[in-house]
A protein has these predicted regions:
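Extracytoplasmic
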Residues: 1-170
């Protein structure tokens, strides 16, 4: 602290400054602009195999207490989920999935671009898995997340899949 009338010693030295000074967290971490799309608000396109429903009150860690649940499909079947974005651009994407003993392996695309050729959602117990998808391009308006069943869980004739949420960060 300084008494009224005091002087700062030494004087500010700015002639050799090469980088902008971080004055707030967003100067280091970016604007923090993110878009969270809950699985349960994504709209399935017509023509998919199996059934799609909202599953609630099953897993306590699901965001908003529910997930989008796709069931009774075969290997090779596809599900397209539509979601809206108010902005366009490149975002870093993460998806939180449910994993379980009867879930299989899937390929994921956003707007027809492969973002992960294979992700296994088979696990010994029901839990959540956060998958980093890297960079994805969003369009203003309608966007599409495409899920393709690559392999069913061992010993199962039909498949199961659950998505909790998609998080996109600038």
């Amino acid at each position: 602290y300084m008494l009224p009338g005091g002087e700062i010693q030494p004087k500010p030295f700015v002639s050799d400054v090469r980088e902008r000074v971080a004055n707030q967290p967003s100067d280091i971490f970016g604007s923090g602009m993110s878009l969270v799309v809950e699985g349960e608000v994504m709209q399935p396109r017509p023509g998919h195999m199996g059934s799609v429903e909202l599953q609630t009150n099953f897993h306590p860690l699901w965001s908003e207490g529910m997930q989008l649940y796709w069931k009774e499909f075969k290997s090779g079947d596809k599900l397209s989920l539509v979601f809206d974005s108010e902005v366009e651009g490149t975002y870093y994407a993460k998806i939180q999935f449910t994993v379980a003993p009867d879930y299989g392996t899937f390929a994921l695309r956003v707007n027809d671009k492969v973002i992960t050729p294979e992700v296994s959602l088979t696990n010994g117990e029901v839990s959540l898995l956060l998958v980093n998808l890297g960079r994805v391009n969003l369009e203003k308006g309608k966007n599409e997340l495409q899920i393709e069943s690559i392999a069913l869980a061992p010993g199962h004739d039909t498949g199961f899949f659950g998505i909790d949420k998609l998080t996109l960060r600038k």
